[in-house]
Amino acid sequence: MGHSRRPAGGEKKSRGFGRSKAVADVGDGRQTGGKPQVKKATFESTKKKEIGVSDLTLLSKISNEAINDNLKLRFEHDEIYTYIGHVLVSVNPFRDLGIYTDNVLQSYRGKNRLEVPPHVFAVAESAYYNMKSYKDNQCVIISGESGAGKTEAAKRIMQYIASVSGGTDSSIQHTKDMVLATNPLLESFGNAKTLRNNNSSRFGKYLELEFNTNGEPVGANITNYLLEKSRVVGQITNERNFHIFYQFTKAAPQKYRDLFGIQQPQSYLYTSRSKCFDVPGVDDSAEFRDTLNAMNVIGMTEGEQDEVFRMLAAILWIGNVQFAEDDSGNAVITDQSVVDYVAYLLEVDAAQVNKAFTIRVMETARGGRRGSVYEVPLNTVQALAVRDALAKAIYFNLFDWIVQRVNASLTARGEVANSIGILDIYGFEIFEKNSFEQLCINYVNEKLQQIFIQLTLKAEQDEYAREQIQWTPIKYFDNKVVCSLIEDKRPPGVFAALNDACATAHADSSAADNTFVGRLNFLSQNPNFENRQGQFIIKHYAGDVSYAVAGMTDKNKDQLLKDLLNLVGTSGNQFVHTLFPEQVNQDDKRRPPTASDKIKASANDLVATLMKAQPSYIRTIKPNDNKAPREYNVGNVLHQIKYLGLQENVRIRRAGFAYRQTFDKFVERFYLLSPKTSYAGDYTWTGDAESGARQILKDTSIPAEEYQMGITKVFVKTPETLFALEAMRDRYWHNMAIRIQRAWRNYLRYRTECAIRIQRFWRRTTGGLEFIKLRDQGHQLLNGRKERRRMSLLGSRRFLGDYIGVGNKGGPGEMVRNGAGISGSEEILFSCRGEVLVSKFGRSSKPAPRILALTNRHVYIIAQNLVNNQLVISSERTIPIGAIKAVGASNLKDDWFSIVVGSPQEPDPLVNCVFKTEFFTHLNNALRGQLNLKIADHIEYNKKPGKLATVKVVKDPAVARDDSYKSGTIHTGPGEPANSVSKPTPRPKQVSARPVTKGKLLRPGGPGGGPSKLAARPTPAAQPLPRATPQPAEPQPAARAVPQPVAAVAASHTRTGSTASVRAPPPPPPAAAPAPKKPTAKVLYDFNSQQSNELSIKAGEIVQIVSKEGNGWWLCMNMTTSAQGWTPEAYLEEQVAPTPKPAPPPPPAAPRSTPAPATNGAAAAAKAKPAPPAPPAKRPNMAARKAVPTPPPAPRDSAVSMNSHDSSGGSGRGTPNSMSNASLAGGLAEALRARQHAMQGKQDDDDDW
């Protein structure tokens, strides 16, 4: 009965876990299977704070007033939906709350009702997945009075199902579009503005969505009921005709205005009688465009649309036909031009229209033979009735044709497996004057209420009694007696009396009404009926309704005069014949079916259809009669709560069972949950279905009070228990899938590891070939003309190029690039740190650190300077590579070279770079092999513009490592022969083979499964760690570390010679230091806590001190109960921890040469107090550092890593660890100052002056 059961396919795994959360949330704390309470915290954290109760079955007091108060509280907080079990109660908010967006819709997809707040989407989700999982037809019955929101609920259900039903095929999507397009189309022709609702459905609609076996929509069918055709010809003040008339007259295109003479709605009687032309917040022109679009989606051709609008125009012009009395009192038409236009629209003869409106043809018959024919003139009242009858007949038949046309387009395009029906029919109506239309509407609502009673109340109790289930019976009101009062033939009901009156006195309307009143006297004995003068009262489930007798018989006849049928039969328009297909049988004397006969048959057919499906219910409530948002009329809502029977529904829900299923289907659904009924997914139980169901419930640990076993069914009390079973079933398949996934992932991991090993081997074999080729090009470029450095010939040496990372995004290299202004379009070929010879006024030239960068366009010499103690990076010199005339270098192993430009404004740079050969190679490639590399025993360059200078290069064996520049001479040590080439690449270190995978499903060692070397290697024995020398430390307030004896420490560091004949036994290890004790305090006085965060203590107790505060309170813990709280400091006396005993002395060692024991032995250490910690070292004096002798120069930094530097001295080429660090400038300042100190020890030369 609308249960949110889990589908067999398990589309959403999260649904099962959600049920676990529900069990933990609502259950009584017992373990109901597996791990249902694991997700409790997650579930609570995702739910927003609940207003009132979301399910009325959770009310502590069950009464109509309590239900009303809860609905009012939730309504005031914009929570319009509330559950009664699986029945949804909806309160119309009369405004958009933003709760029907796609995001909200997706949040309900695949969720049971307890995982998410109450919503109409949850009802749609339950119906759809129950249909898909259990192959049961579903229906959603939406009930409530007019204006309560039934139509909106039906549209939202269609919106949800269209969204989640899947199917990417174009035909399926087209079916969805057509189903959704039926809403604006049928609303425009079937809805109207009433006093209580701006978009009131004036017809009943049962939409049946048809699905294939995959749950994809393949078609639909619409059945319409009770179109209020009387609204076409008249409305009360402030109401409107059907929407389509105002849409058409306001927004009709010029084509229709020319063809059909369409004017504004004020020009027509049928649209202006009520003096209401507009609806607040509704744009009729925009609605008309939606209607035309819906017609196109449905597949109506342009010709069909033209005929529909022709009929609408004909109805409007028929209403403008007016009559007057002639001298004889007969009706005559006042404006013949209107009749002529009506005849043009209907394509009939105008004279025939005149005759049909003003004359009635009567025929007498005698003895079964045709008699005389008479033409009886009509008076004005009769003529108006004939005119209106024609207009109503055209519109009624036109509406039926539209529904049939929609059904033809929605015909199933595949095999239909199941269906979901949505019933949207206007609700119970009570007006000041109620007539035949209200009687029919209220009769249908009585039938729907009877279904609800039968399926939710009576059927519930009957099934419990039939299955011998113990439960508490609930009294309820069965409205079957009211339905019998209206529809029964024996004894005759209201409809039977009405039909009898119409048949007896069919000629005179007033006589027929009087006859009807007489027939109603026979119903006076019925307790639900009262007959009064000119009216009668029926006691409906929604309240007592008084119906006026006047005019009921005429409305019940529902017959179109044969004269009008003959008129439309002469039409030359084929569409008119389609609307009126029946032929007039002049000899048929049988009484045609009346309106009450038709509505009775339709209602019974509807009931039969609904009884074949599993229903879900939405009970809509109208909070006020003013259509005002945020207004809640307590009295009106309380009345609706009573007649909807919500209190009885809550009571029976609380007393009954949420789920029931036959034994065989229950076992079929859940046999996987018991190891005794299944193995590897196969059903293995050999007993009957009942015993199998019991075994499943036993193995899933369902408490006995949560279910009962009936005669043929198992009954589960709460939905949470069912959710737990479904969650376990989902986890079963989930676990099976995990096993398959684990094996597949293990194989993929194995395959990936194999590929990685092959790639690693290939990269190891061929990796770096490009850089090795560049290195070989460097050998060719030097061509045996220059001695080589030993490090340059290493086999692992590669020409990597951009050592500083100037071409990288992010990091220090990007800072250098941005500071130097290197364009992003330039490709970085080479970057490295080096030195440039800098000339200063009055001083000798000195090397200064710089960054050398080479791109495909320029050579950049980049400087790093301190400005206002901030590091500033800038390009000191930018040289286009095309302007380089030559590069000069010596034939020794030094790293100096000149870049000869010959600029008239700037000197040529003389550069010192450890990767000079790599620079030459990249520059030669950038110049496409046109580099002029001059190698000699000296280096030439323009020291000043136009002034050629020569730098001598001298081989000095005294230079151990790096070359040095002084007074125009470079001193360098001997190098490798000039014809030397790089050594072969060294072989990598051999490592043991690793298993391809460590998984349990595949054997280690590779595809063959052989043992790996790693697995065969024995595990090394654990070696004891040497004891560290004790370091002075701060004394701890709780406990002190036990000092080791000096002899033991000395013995642990004594190295025994290999020639010793006897090894003394090692001393025993010292005793382990006891764990530090927590500080404790003794309670001096009793203290009783006054607040929840305070701790009560008694004098003499020992408590543990957790923390101390400076405000006179200590946080303490009772060592017996572990309770914590705040206690006053004055009530406590802190206990001093005793000094631990020293370790026992070691046994005497054998007589051998061992160090003498120190004076501070173990006993002295035990007695000595711990020394206070040494004060922190003072900050070094920078002035004193200048007097320190210059340390030997450190190896030059090649800038391979940005993190290598020495701030204490050296060549000063180092840079800070990170250019993004805040101390970068300070570190660089230290480096620059260190270089200045180093240079002070060198003698200045006067080579510049």
Swiss-Prot record:
Belongs to the TRAFAC class myosin-kinesin ATPase superfamily. Myosin family. ATP binds at residues 144-151. This is Myosin-1. SMART domains: MYSc, SH3. PROSITE patterns: MYOSIN_MOTOR, SH3, TH1. The gene is myoA. The keyword Hydrolase applies. The keyword Transcription does not apply. Residues 1076-1137 form the SH3 domain. Residues 419-501 are annotated as: Actin-binding. Type-I myosin implicated in the organization of the actin cytoskeleton. Required for proper actin cytoskeleton polarization. At the cell cortex, assembles in patch-like structures together with proteins from the actin-polymerizing machinery and promotes actin assembly. Functions as actin nucleation-promoting factor (NPF) for the Arp2/3 complex. Plays an important role in polarized growth, spore germination, hyphal morphogenesis, and septal wall formation. The modification Phosphoserine is found at residue 372. It is found in: Cytoplasm, Cytoskeleton, Actin patch. GO terms for cellular component: actin cortical patch; actin cytoskeleton; cell tip; cytoplasm; myosin complex; plasma membrane. Its main location: cytoplasm. Residues 734-754, 755-780 form the IQ domain. It comes from Aspergillus fumigatus (strain ATCC MYA-4609 / CBS 101355 / FGSC A1100 / Af293). PANTHER family: MYOSIN, MYOSIN-3-RELATED. Residues 51-730 form the Myosin motor domain. Residues 1200-1221 have a biased composition (Polar residues). Phosphorylation of the TEDS site (Ser-372) is required for the polarization of the actin cytoskeleton. Phosphorylation probably activates the myosin-I ATPase activity. Residues 1-42, 962-1079, 1126-1249 are annotated as: Disordered. GO terms for biological process: actin cortical patch localization; actin filament organization; endocytosis. The myosin motor domain displays actin-stimulated ATPase activity and generates a mechanochemical force.
